[in-house]
């Protein structure tokens, strides 16, 4: 199951948290969800060069709080904060409620799956060979401390007539282990030959320890050994 399912959804409430944190009545749910999708699409286009890794949307009492995780916060804020004010106005029009925007810096962008995927997509759009772009991103991630990384690209690679998929992996990426901290992201590269799809898995340190007491697990192991001996 871990091979097919979205790794982020698979690990929600274990090592991952929700990107949208709000509650809505069943009659309003579709409207609020559509607003979230519009906001994310707008930010993806507006901040294409700001290396945005994650956008968190919260909706406390008749307002909204948006947290943008970016490797280049200066690009998001702009000179003297001009760009962030324009951003707030546009988001307020989209959501129809007062907006508060927080900017958080990503310290190690080489380990952020979304930034890696978007970076490779931009290189593919500039006609960089896909193997070179993928291997360079993998080397940077492993050099920065990743325990494993896997990158897959699909489509008309190098302008081939028949679409195919190629993937490369370095280190280990345990997709079945729920406590493993696996960051997953997708992106698209729009080239003259069509759209190329990208998927990135990054495995970093930060496994969650078992909540069971250590002495309890030892007692159970001892009990199993005694049962096997009898």
Curated annotation (Swiss-Prot):
Gene Ontology biological process terms from the UniProt entry: translation
Keywords assigned: Ribonucleoprotein, Ribosomal protein, RNA-binding, rRNA-binding
Keyword Ribonucleoprotein: yes
Region (Disordered): 210-230
Pfam entry (one): KH_2
A molecular function (GO) term: structural constituent of ribosome
InterPro entries in alphabetical order: KH_dom, KH_dom-like_a/b, KH_dom_type_2, KH_sf_prok-type, Ribosomal_S3_C_sf, Ribosomal_uS3_bac-typ, Ribosomal_uS3_C, Ribosomal_uS3_CS
PANTHER family reported in the protein's UniProt record: 30S/40S RIBOSOMAL PROTEIN S3, SMALL RIBOSOMAL SUBUNIT PROTEIN US3C
Family note: Belongs to the universal ribosomal protein uS3 family.
Protein name: Small ribosomal subunit protein uS3
Species this protein is from: Neisseria gonorrhoeae (strain ATCC 700825 / FA 1090)
Organism lineage string: Bacteria, Pseudomonadati, Pseudomonadota, Betaproteobacteria, Neisseriales
């Amino acid at each position: 199951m871990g091979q097919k399912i979205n790794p982020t959804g698979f690990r929600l409430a274990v090592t991952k948290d929700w990107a949208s944190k709000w509650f809505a009545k069943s009659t309003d749910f579709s409207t609020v969800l559509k607003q979230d999708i519009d906001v994310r699409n707008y930010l993806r286009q507006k901040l294409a060069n700001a290396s945005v890794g994650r956008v968190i949307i919260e909706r406390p009492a008749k307002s909204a709080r948006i947290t943008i995780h970016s490797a280049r916060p200066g690009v998001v804020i702009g000179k003297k904060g001009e760009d962030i004010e324009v951003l707030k106005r546009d988001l307020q029009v989209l959501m129809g409620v007062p907006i508060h925007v927080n900017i958080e810096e990503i310290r190690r962008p080489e380990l952020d799956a979304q930034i890696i995927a978007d970076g490779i997509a931009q290189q593919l759009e500039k006609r960089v060979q896909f193997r070179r772009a993928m291997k360079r991103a993998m080397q940077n991630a492993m050099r920065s401390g990743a325990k494993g990384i896997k990158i897959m690209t699909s489509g008309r690679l190098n302008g081939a007539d028949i679409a195919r998929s190629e993937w490369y992996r370095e280190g280990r990426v345990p997709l079945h282990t729920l406590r493993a901290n696996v960051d997953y992201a997708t992106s698209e590269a729009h080239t003259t030959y069509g759209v190329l799809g990208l998927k990135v898995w990054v495995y970093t340190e930060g496994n969650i320890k078992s909540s069971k007491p250590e002495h309890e697990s030892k007692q159970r192991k001892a009990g199993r050994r005694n049962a096997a001996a009898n």
